[in-house]
């Protein structure tokens, strides 16, 4: 066991350096898209979002959603699932734990 720990301690700096080298470009890409995609909506985008919600409610009331193509229905389902999961992530962060959720 001591040999394993000594061997691991000898290899740790090179393993950490390799991990840092591997993750630097990926982290830069992540931060680029995070800055673009995770910004709050501007005041000009809010009326567009409200109009979009009104059209969704109207299509649900009139039954127009039955005329969606399969591709549109799948995309709408994926977006709804993403919003639902972000809600759960926010709840988990707010409670500071997964306990109490059927995850």
Curated annotation (Swiss-Prot):
GO molecular function: proton transmembrane transporter activity
Disulfide bonds, paired cysteine numbers: none
UniProt main location, coarse: mitochondrion
Record-level GO BP terms: proton motive force-driven ATP synthesis; proton motive force-driven mitochondrial ATP synthesis
Modified residues (N-acetylalanine): 2
Keywords noted in UniProt: Acetylation, ATP synthesis, CF(0), Hydrogen ion transport, Ion transport, Membrane, Mitochondrion, Mitochondrion inner membrane, Transport
InterPro entries: ATP_synth_F0_gsu_mt, ATP_synth_su_G_mt_met
Subunit structure: Component of the ATP synthase complex composed at least of ATP5F1A/subunit alpha, ATP5F1B/subunit beta, ATP5MC1/subunit c (homooctomer), MT-ATP6/subunit a, MT-ATP8/subunit 8, ATP5ME/subunit e, ATP5MF/subunit f, ATP5MG/subunit g, ATP5MK/subunit k, ATP5MJ/subunit j, ATP5F1C/subunit gamma, ATP5F1D/subunit delta, ATP5F1E/subunit epsilon, ATP5PF/subunit F6, ATP5PB/subunit b, ATP5PD/subunit d, ATP5PO/subunit OSCP.
Family: Belongs to the ATPase g subunit family.
The protein's role, per its UniProt record: Subunit g, of the mitochondrial membrane ATP synthase complex (F(1)F(0) ATP synthase or Complex V) that produces ATP from ADP in the presence of a proton gradient across the membrane which is generated by electron transport complexes of the respiratory chain. ATP synthase complex consist of a soluble F(1) head domain - the catalytic core - and a membrane F(1) domain - the membrane proton channel. These two domains are linked by a central stalk rotating inside the F(1) region and a stationary peripheral stalk.
Name of the protein: ATP synthase F(0) complex subunit g, mitochondrial
Species this chain originates from: Rattus norvegicus
Gene transcribed to yield this protein: Atp5mg
